Structures are given as C-alpha cells and as structure tokens.
Design a protein with these regions (language model features):
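Bacterial Sec-dependent N-terminal signal peptides
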Residues: 1-31
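Short, low-complexity N-terminal intrinsically disordered segments enriched in polar/charged residues
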Residues: 21-62, 160-167
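A solvent-exposed, acidic/Ser-Thr-rich amphipathic alpha-helical stretch
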Residues: 34-38, 56-112
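Solvent-exposed loop/turn segments at secondary-structure junctions
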Residues: 66, 74-77, 121-123, 154-156
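Short, cysteine-centered beta-strand-loop-beta hairpins and adjacent loop/turn segments enriched
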Residues: 94-96, 122-130
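A short hydrophobic beta-strand element
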Residues: 111-120
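Short beta-strand edge/turn micro-motifs at domain boundaries
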Residues: 132-159
Length: 167
C-alpha cells in the first residue's frame, strides 16, 4: 500500500521540479545593429553640432531628466537641469572656438537599452587635434526615443605634470 502511494507522490514531485526548473523561451526581436548605430551616431552628431552652436538646451536634450553625467575631474552632475547648467557655464566661459567630434566605436543592445563605447576628439577652429579620449553612454528607449541615462568620459592624452612648488 505504501509503495502505491509513494510512486505517485514521487512522480508528482519530479514533474513539479522539471516543470518549475524549465526555462520558458520568449521570442525577442533581434536588434538591427546597423540601424541602431546610425541612430546613435546621429545623436552624437547632433550633440556636437549643438555644442559648436553654443546651444546648451539642444545639448541637454541628449539626456533623460534623471540622467547622471560623470565628467572628468569634477563631481557627477545629477539630472538634465544640472547637466544643462554645467554645459551652459562651459559654453559661456569658452573663448577658444574649439569643438569636438564624437564617434561610435561599439554598441551593445538588449531590449530597450543600449550601451555605447565611443571616442571623442577636441579640435581647434583650424581642425588641429588638441585632445582625445573615450566615453561610455548608457541609453534607454523612452516614449520611442533613446535618451542618455548615464555617461562618463576619460582623456587618452596623458595629464600634464603639476608645476613644481616654489621653494
């Protein structure tokens, strides 16, 4: 009698475990990486054009309202308003006429999220290269449009040595 009860119970437990542990496959649409690269490069080009035009509002449109930007040698800027304020300050203080170019190097995408690895080059008005580096931007698609949620950048050029203190 006990064997008759144990067998169905064991079969039931085994069935439950196999069912619970099996992964359900969900169909996801593959991301068209070439189309995505063109879209993100367009955003980078618009960012550079807005910087060159000294339009802080257009530059800040790249970012989500809750974005955080981790720039070199300063505290993170939290929120689009703070990022815009920093951009406006930089634009106001700039008297060089230098401009930057941004290029997509690599993209990783999943669902509504994209991570971009890019390169930047800062040039003088004549087009001579002054500085360069790399950046990483994390985008989320919100209301059908990608917005930068986090970004950070580094310079590839070695830092200039600090001046020696006067003795």
């Amino acid at each position: 009698m006990r064997l008759k009860i144990k067998v169905p119970v064991l079969i039931g437990i085994a069935s439950f475990l196999f069912t619970a542990c099996s992964s359900s496959k969900t169909e996801t649409n593959p991301v068209d990486m070439e189309k995505l690269k063109t879209e993100i490069q367009g955003m980078e080009d618009a960012f550079a054009a807005a910087e060159k035009a000294k339009d802080a509002t257009a530059v800040a449109a790249y970012y989500s309202e809750d974005a955080i930007s981790y720039a070199r040698n300063k505290a993170p800027e939290v929120g689009r308003a703070a990022i815009k304020e920093s951009i406006a300050k930089n634009i106001k203080e700039d008297t060089t006429g230098n401009h930057s170019e941004y290029k997509v190097v690599d993209l990783f995408a999943e669902g509504n999220m994209v991570v971009e690895i890019g390169s930047w080059t800062n040039m003088n008005p004549a087009g001579a290269r002054l500085d360069s580096g790399h950046y990483m931007s994390f985008f989320q698609k919100r209301d059908g449009k990608y917005l930068c949620v986090r970004d950070m950048n580094v310079a590839s050029t070695p830092a200039k040595p600090a001046a020696k203190p006067v003795q």
